[in-house]
């Protein structure tokens, strides 16, 4: 097939079945021509599909998205960038699209890549548009990872659907004890708060939290921790409570 002739036909002809002709072009490896057919017909999403699936040029797809500036095009670009592990670029594209629909995959890949801090902006967009426990839960965790504790306090004071206890445990396991303290306090989980305060060397606070928890195993933990730290007066208080 003479590609120059095909291009000329596309420019001159009209009234043909766009999808059928574009498919024939793709089947024959004429990807640029298929892109041209879809673009001329204003089938922008199909044109974008050709760029990312057949021509395989994310840079050209980015240029195409910038040129058209349409939500559905930004969204398609975001998915292609995510598939190519361009995580930050993908999140930026989804934000431009105001499209939170692929949040599960975005969260999974961003967290695996250690991009929690950059994920915050995407999650802020997603929270405005949808009410999902996973989004709020990840948002709280990302704020903790970014050490944005004042923002976390503000988030916890507002209505949210986060699994706060899960985030608290995750932060505790990561050694983010100040974040854990805020999280456990916000849900009045005094048993876990007591343990966290021991790690923060706040022994009087830990004893008070243990008292509120009223749990024998928590008191035993307080007793051992206070002895280990040389806090004998507090260890005696904990021991008497066991």
Summary of predicted features, one role per range:
Residues 1-242:
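Extended alpha-helical assembly domains of large eukaryotic scaffold proteins
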């Amino acid at each position: 097939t003479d590609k120059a002739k095909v291009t000329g036909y596309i420019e001159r002809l009209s009234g043909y079945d766009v999808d059928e002709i574009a498919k024939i072009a793709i089947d024959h490896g004429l990807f640029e021509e298929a892109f041209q057919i879809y673009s001329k017909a204003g089938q922008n999403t199909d044109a974008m599909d050709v760029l990312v699936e057949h021509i395989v040029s994310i840079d050209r797809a980015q240029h195409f998205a910038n040129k058209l500036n349409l939500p559905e095009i930004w969204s398609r670009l975001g998915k292609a960038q995510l598939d190519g592990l361009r995580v930050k670029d993908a999140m930026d594209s989804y934000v431009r699209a105001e499209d939170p629909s692929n949040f599960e995959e975005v969260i999974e890949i961003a967290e695996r890549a250690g991009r929690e801090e950059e994920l915050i902006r995407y999650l802020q967009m997603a929270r405005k548009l949808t009410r999902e426990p996973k989004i709020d839960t990840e948002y709280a965790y990302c704020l903790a990872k970014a050490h944005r504790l004042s923002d976390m306090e503000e988030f916890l004071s507002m209505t949210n659907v986060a699994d706060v206890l899960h985030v608290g445990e995750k932060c505790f396991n990561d050694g983010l004890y100040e974040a854990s303290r805020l999280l456990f306090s916000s849900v009045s989980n005094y048993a876990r708060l007591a343990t966290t305060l021991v790690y923060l060397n706040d022994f009087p606070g830990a004893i008070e939290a243990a008292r509120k928890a009223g749990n024998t195993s928590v008191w035993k933990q307080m007793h051992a921790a206070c002895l280990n730290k040389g806090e004998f007066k507090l260890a005696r208080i904990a021991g008497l409570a066991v």
